Amino acid sequence: MPGTDEALPATMAWRSLRAMCRRSLARQAELSVEGSHHVPASGPVVIAARHYHHLLDGCAIGTTIDRHLHILVAADWASGGLARGVLDRATRVARWPVVLRPDATRHRPERFAAPGAIAAYEADAAMAMRRAARETVALLRGGHALLVFPEGYPTIDPTFTPKTRDDETLPFQPGVIRLVALAQADGETRVPVVPAGLAYERIGEDRWRIALRFGEPVAISGRDRSADIAALTARVRDLSGLGADAGEGGGAISLSGR
């Protein structure tokens, strides 16, 4: 369990963030919630959610669940300077695991044109992943709640998204299954994975009607990661009001309108 010197700043940071999120939601969203009872009130849990909006997804879930959430975040969107420094400090205080998305070099090659830039980034990404895995396992074994977005990229993002349609969900990354398996490898920890669906409807220039739906925990065997990730993907898409297969679903919002 984290010591008081470590836990208190993280708790204070979370309370401040929740207050900011409530203000953002009041300005930008009408939120409805179903199934929040599926999230255990205590003990380790991973909430695996659809990623639609870069900001409001986390705010909707974080203000709904009456628990201190830790969020697995990607930091590669902040390439350096002040933004990266602020992000690094904030995630350390909040005890949020941080990764660098390995496919960033493919999606945004213009950022890696300098000689050796790709190799350096790949080394940094591997190091960040190992550190995030250690931190995640420690959090889960310590009884904490973790929010992850297995797609890796939101649909609405001011920096970059590889998505081209409103109803598109990217293939879920299997890392979430691996992290759960690592946490459970001690033979004592059991980590339920709660799927969370998000459905957005635009009701103004920058205002949304958001339906957040939690489902029953998905059984993660850890023995067949492909089957585990397929089951989780299908459940999150279903809760989001999309088809069972990626690429199906009713897209009511054009990405060109973002």
Residue ranges and their predicted role:
Residues M1-A26, I253-S256:
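N-terminal membrane-anchoring alpha-helices
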Residues A19-R23, A60, A90, E135, ...:
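Amphipathic alpha-helical segments that form well-ordered structural scaffolds
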Residues M20-Y52:
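Helix-to-loop junction immediately C-terminal to a conserved catalytic motif
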Residues V33, I47, I71-L72, V193, ...:
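Generic preference for hydrophobic
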Residues H37, H51, A75-W77, G197-Y200:
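Short, flexible loop/turn elements at secondary-structure junctions
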Residues G43-Y121:
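Catalytic core of membrane glycerolipid acyltransferases/transacylases, capturing the structured
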Residues A114-R258:
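Non-catalytic C-terminal accessory region of glycerolipid acyltransferases
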